[in-house]
Amino acid sequence: WREGKGPDAVRVMGSVTAMETSEDFDGPCLQSWQIGGSRVDLGYGPLLYDVAIELTGGLTSDRTSVSGEAEAVWDYYSKNRSDVEVVQLDIPDDYFEDQLTPDDPNDDCSQVPAYDRYGSNWHKSGLSKLIKKSGTPVVDELRARDMLVEK
């Protein structure tokens, strides 16, 4: 977020780190990206997640640990956002749960937070989804307003 004028006129409202899922650790996860960490001022989480979703082409929650606030964002995306595509990821076969798509190993993805919280109903959680967007409208608007600092 830029305040004032000049190259040093920047106020950081938060940051989000996205990293590719690791097939060895997380499973194939449809070759998606996951949240690696975030620090966000109150109210800016969804905006930063929008940016991360647009820049990665598809994003999941952290595969091992998610805060309650972040879970609420993922649930909102999966149930209420008409501008996103929600893709259900499957649970790996080593969880001893029935898989949703046992013939497709490409969507197998670690479901630690969803499974820890919801057990056999893990698939109903927004934490079990991959979120995609078409295009980069939020990023484009932030760039046009010189409000996005990318590193």
Feature map (PLM): residue ranges:
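A conserved beta-strand-loop-helix scaffold within acyl/acetyltransferase catalytic domains
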Residues: 1-39
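Compositionally biased, intrinsically disordered low-complexity regions enriched in proline and serine
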Residues: 2, 45, 50, 96, ...
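Conserved acetyl-CoA-binding loop-helix of GNAT-fold acetyltransferases
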Residues: 35-55
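Terminal substrate-recognition subdomain of acyl/acetyltransferases
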Residues: 16-24, 57-151
